[in-house]
Every structure is written in structure tokens, then in C-alpha cells.
Amino acid sequence: MYKEVLYEVKLKSKCIKGDMMGFEVSDRAKEINERLEAFMEEYIYPRERDYDEFTNDQNNLWQYPDWYEKLKEEAKKQELWNLFLPKEYAPWSPGLTNLEIAGLFETMSRSAWSQQIFNCNAPDRGNMEVLAKYGTPEQQKQWLEPLLAGEIRSAYAMTEPDVASSDATNMELEITRDGDEYVLNGKKWWTTNVITPKCKFMLVMGKSNPENPRHTQHSTIIVPTDAEGFTITRALRSLGELHSPGGEGDVVFKNVRVPVSN
């Protein structure tokens, strides 16, 4: 059954082979995708059943299989690591365009979990782009480099339980300056990836300038997951699933203090 399903998915996903709606894909991107497809065949698809059995076992909540890191090391060895960063993010980018990256993601997405093996999954992917573009050298050294190396994971906290969070200007979590620190108070939920022990920090959106016009009231700040006053109150279910090992967290910030440099 697994082979039949995988075969059907692969048949439907071939845009990287040639042109995409008139957009040409470089020979380099095609070559990378060929290696990526070979990796999926050799290392990912044979582990699909193992992954499902491991993550569906309640005794393994918020843990990763023992073989997980071995696959990540193999992806690094084959230079299939951090492929998602567009070329403007030098020196960390492999130098691909967004068009070229799109086809690679199509291949990775034939497995629900394989993007993690290539260090290309959300929310880490988005957080790495934010830190690469806007982070200070100190922030990049402390948070971006370990993320790029796959040593840690991260979360992005935006959605709130008490407001219509599809409009980001509604966010109410308070970010107040107190000397050399910012103090955070509020709630977030559906905070993807926050429950896994490997998650070491979050990018948190909150209201830092309530007196400003509506679209300039908010800021994003780095908050370590071990910060005093930060609590994960429960794991949320999506479509009945806990989505271990990353999880979806209902979280509270109660007088959480972080340096202004964050």
C-alpha cells in the first residue's frame, strides 16, 4: 500500500524536470533535484512506516526516532542541506532562486516529514530567513548558526486566542520596555514546534507601540523557551492529532523579561 501511494504522488509531481509555466529552471537546479529524488528513494520512503509507528506511539511523544539524526547527517554529506535560503542570503545560501527552490520543495513534500531531514521545514525556515535578513551579528551567532546547523529548533508565536488573528494588527500581547529589558505579557496559541525539547527560542510578535498607527504598533522579539515566566499550558490537537514531535502549543507569557538586544 505504501509503495502504491508513493508512486501515485511521484507521478503527479514533475515540474522541476522542465519548464514551469514558461519559466526555465537552471541545469544546476535540475541536477540538485535529481540527487534529492535519489535521496528520497533511498532514505526517506523506506522510513515512512517507521516514522508513523514511532510518532503514533504515545510513549514517544515529543521525541525523534534514533535514526533521524543519521539521515540529517547524510543530507549534509550529500549537500542537500539548507536548500531553502534564496541567493540573496549569502553566505548561508546555496545560491538558488525562489523559482528553483520551489521545485525542490515539491520533491521534498512527497513525504510529510522529510523537510526536517534537509533542515528546510517551518517554522525554522521562516525564522532563519528573518534572522539572516534582519538579525544582528550577535543574534545570528547565538540563534541563526545553531538553526542552520540543525542543532536546535525554534517556534514562531503570533496567533492569539482572544482576537481574530488572521489580521496581524489585532495582536494584543504586550511588549513594554523597562530599562535594558523588554517585558512580555499575554497569550499565544497554535505555536508550532514549541513543545519539542529541541525548541530553544521563539520569535514572538507583540504590541510594542500602542500609540502608533495601527500598522506600526507591533514588533517581533526573540524569547528563549527557558525564560522565566514563559509557560506551555497545553498541547493542542489539530484534526485530532498532537503532531508530535513538534506540537502546537497554548502558551502564556507572564512578566517574561528579555534583553533589549533581543
Can you name each region flagged by the protein language model?
Residues 95-107, 167-170, 252, 257-258:
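Structural signature of FAD isoalloxazine-binding scaffolds in flavoprotein oxidoreductases
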Residues 173-176:
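A structural signal for short hydrophobic beta-strand segments in well-ordered beta-sheet cores
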Residues 114-128, 149-157, 187-202:
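FAD-binding core of FAD-dependent oxidoreductases
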Residues 11-122, 138-149, 153:
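Amphipathic, small/basic residue-rich leader segments at the start of a protein or domain
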Residues 79, 104-110, 205-207, 223-228, ...:
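Short Ser/Thr-interspersed hydrophobic loop/turn segments at strand-loop and sheet-helix junctions
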